[in-house]
Amino acid sequence: MRVLLRCCCGHLPVGGGAGRRSNPRWRALARLSASPGWEDGQGARVREKPPWRVLFFGNDQFARETLRALHAARENKEEELIEKLEVVTVPSPSPKGLPVKQYAVQSQLPVYEWPDVGSGEYDVGVVASFGRLLSEAFILKFPYGILNVHPSCLPRWRGPAPIIHTILHGDTIAGVTIMQIKPRRFDVGPILKQETVPVPPKSTSKELEAVLSRLGANMLISVLKNLPESLNNGRQQPAEGVTHAPKISAATSCIKWEEQTSEQIFRLYRAVGNIIPLQTLWMDNTIKLLDLVEVDNSILSDSKLTGQAVIPGSVIYHKQSQILLVCCKDDWIGVRSVMLKKTLTATDFYNGYLHPWYQKNSQAQPSQCRFQTLRLPPKKKQKKKIVAMQ
């Protein structure tokens, strides 16, 4: 008869790693755990194989795919991988809640809003895009610890926005890491499984998220099928190659015309454009660039673009293609629509703003009528909170 370890006394130091294997206490417990139905010293037995009881933590669309895979595994009675599945998500201003909560409610899964985590007993926790640090005391309540589905090849892109930074920096290879959570710091725990995929050319962060979310969900199920073995074979992250993926802000979306090349601007657009529209200044007004397009070579050969020195940020309306051409550090980008009080096509913007300006200032140089870099004050850094759950 299998009996699960009570949540309040889970002190099994599972998960391999050189540090724990060299610890005498870990070696002693490992020898004990090798015997069938080993006890933790308080009379409770630890389940040695599936089905597992899982507490899932997540919020967004990426996490939703992981939850969907866990739910499908729970519904598959033939495999007997998941016996119990409950969900923790953060509160949302929307009555519907975030994607994870929506899925949990639709699927009739028990769902708690952080910091409430319920009072059930679980074998293992799973985190995907949760964004909250968990205390060591809380992690130790899970006999098999807490796993994290992270959409990067750790240690590259530690932090809350790995997919965005993958696109932003022009990476050609992306991936997913299944790792074990450690307290006090994000994304530093032992790696249990890691796979890579090529980044499709000109992929947006949303498109790459869809690819990586499916990959990560499948990898997690694979790890859960051989959980004790996966934990014992975990490897520490290398010290080399560490990069960080901080959370984006409105300031991230501000184009620096004098500093950024057309390639960098398009990467920025593909990375954050679906979350925060790119922004700039026009005549002291903030203007959002909604639809960016690459400029055809035939347009770039126009004498208006090549016949004079043009200052970065200069705006020219190209009537034939009905786009705004904007000069950046090394080239031009095209803009099909903008938002200035309301959404305007490039033609609307020209007729309503550019053309009247030129009529009033017929002697002025085109360089005087240009987009300029919008400087937003950086957000104050907030202290990370480690929540010690009861």
Swiss-Prot record:
Keyword Mitochondrion: yes
Major localization class: mitochondrion
Catalysed reactions, semicolon-separated: L-methionyl-tRNA(fMet) + (6R)-10-formyltetrahydrofolate = N-formyl-L-methionyl-tRNA(fMet) + (6S)-5,6,7,8-tetrahydrofolate + H(+)
Oxidoreductase among keywords: no
EC annotation from Swiss-Prot or TrEMBL: 2.1.2.9
GO BP annotations listed: conversion of methionyl-tRNA to N-formyl-methionyl-tRNA
One annotated GO molecular function: methionyl-tRNA formyltransferase activity
Gene Ontology CC annotations of this record: mitochondrial matrix; mitochondrion
InterPro entries in UniProt: Fmt, Formyl_trans_C, Formyl_transf_N, Formyl_transf_N_sf, Formyl_transferase-like_C_sf, Met-tRNA-FMT_N
Cell location: Mitochondrion
SUPFAM superfamilies: FMT C-terminal domain-like, Formyltransferase
Keywords for the protein's UniProt record, in alphabetical order: Mitochondrion, Protein biosynthesis, Transferase, Transit peptide
Transit peptide, UniProt annotation: 1-33
Its biological purpose: Methionyl-tRNA formyltransferase that formylates methionyl-tRNA in mitochondria and is crucial for translation initiation.
Domain notes per entry: Composed of an N- and a C-terminal domain. The N-terminal domain carries the tetrahydrofolate (THF)-binding site and the C-terminal domain is presumably involved in positioning the Met-tRNA substrate for the formylation reaction.
Family of this protein: Belongs to the Fmt family.
PANTHER family in the cross-refs: METHIONYL-TRNA FORMYLTRANSFERASE, METHIONYL-TRNA FORMYLTRANSFERASE, MITOCHONDRIAL
Descriptive protein name: Methionyl-tRNA formyltransferase, mitochondrial
Species annotation: Bos taurus (Bovine)
Lineage per the UniProt record: Eukaryota, Metazoa, Chordata, Craniata, Vertebrata
Gene name tied to this protein: MTFMT
